[in-house]
Swiss-Prot record:
It holds the Pfam family SDF. It comes from Desulfitobacterium hafniense (strain Y51). Keywords: Amino-acid transport, Cell membrane, Membrane, Symport, Transmembrane, Transmembrane helix, Transport. GO terms for molecular function: neutral L-amino acid:sodium symporter activity. Belongs to the dicarboxylate/amino acid:cation symporter (DAACS) (TC 2.A.23) family. It comes from the Bacteria. Involved in the import of serine and threonine into the cell, with the concomitant import of sodium (symport system). This is Serine/threonine transporter SstT. The gene is sstT. GO terms for biological process: serine transport; threonine transport. The keyword Manganese does not apply. It catalyses: L-serine(in) + Na(+)(in) = L-serine(out) + Na(+)(out); L-threonine(in) + Na(+)(in) = L-threonine(out) + Na(+)(out). GO terms for cellular component: plasma membrane.
Amino acid sequence: MKELLRKWNNISLVKRILMGLIIGIMLALWIPDIAAPVAILGNLFVGALKAVAPVLVLILVMGAIANHKSGQQTNMKSILILYLLGTFLAGVTAVIASFMFPVSIALAAGAEDITAPGGITEVLLSLLMNVVDNPVKALMNANYIGILSWAILLGLALRTAGESTKQLIGDFADAVSKVVKWVINLAPLGILGLVFDSIATSGLEVLLGYGKLLLLLVGCMVFVALIINPLIVYLKIRKNPYPLVFRCLRESGITAFFTRSSAANIPVNLTLCEKLGLDRNTYSISIPLGATINMAGAAVTIAVLTLAAVHTLGITVDIPTAIILSVLSAIAACGASGVAGGSLLLIPLACSLFGISNDIAMQVVGVGFIIGVVQDSCETALNSSTDVLFTAAAEYGEWRKEGKAF
């Protein structure tokens, strides 16, 4: 048994995940009723990641700031600029693609009972209120903006603490990181359960009716992942960005695709940053921050579904309005984590720019929920893998200036 486990652990995690993926698809297509209990593996995996992530973020960020030496360089400014630039360019890409390949949709009912935010002010206010959330409540609800703010404050307060206290925090961080590695090793079983549940519950037929819309959405996200992001990274590191891009997509994007949660993928991203040799003081802050504000996939979803509604209703859009939509979708996407339902419930906000009534806008949200299995998975994979990509690009850019190899 020990020999079998040793051989299993010697197989790379990505290969093990692919094995779980294939088995999950086969079970869902061939024996969905008999294999139904398999779905619980996915729920347990996502639950474990979501449980450990808030504690990990609090301790890592607190420790990084408490142990930060005066004059020690971090790349947070560069990373923030990359996050915002990437999200904006994703919105621009979605707007241009929607004009090049206009798609009309059959509006769906069923989302009228959900309350969307009233405007961009409400979204930003919600984000600000999350900053001053009760720390215990923030941990319980996985409010990463609140967790980050408390971790930063506690870290600053502990800057003057004794070395033994700082060492204790470091030991706690190492212990939680070890737990995270144990959980991530269970990813193949988790992915098996998640992919089984998705196919067995939703089926493939429900998605075929919105094929063109899905093609446009996924096409935009793939374009951002394989063209826009590599271009941004190249401008930063001045060398072939694709090895880094593909590694981030492979080791972060795959798990994010199936967990459909940027928060649950934080431990995966932190582990990948460690493998890439990045500075822990930087990535322990930038990764949870990215899970909150780096939302290129959300910007694509908001812009594409809004313009699909516009084309369905035959509304003419001029260039200035299209530019405003690009900016609005980027700003709204950055606030998506502060809204229950995420990017889909920010669609009525963007629709209001074109005078589309809330009733129709909520029907567009209904369409979003129908295609959510694919849309949300691709969106999360893009969002989460980009967190690591831009964190690495910012640090490698500094290494290039210093003449260090990477």
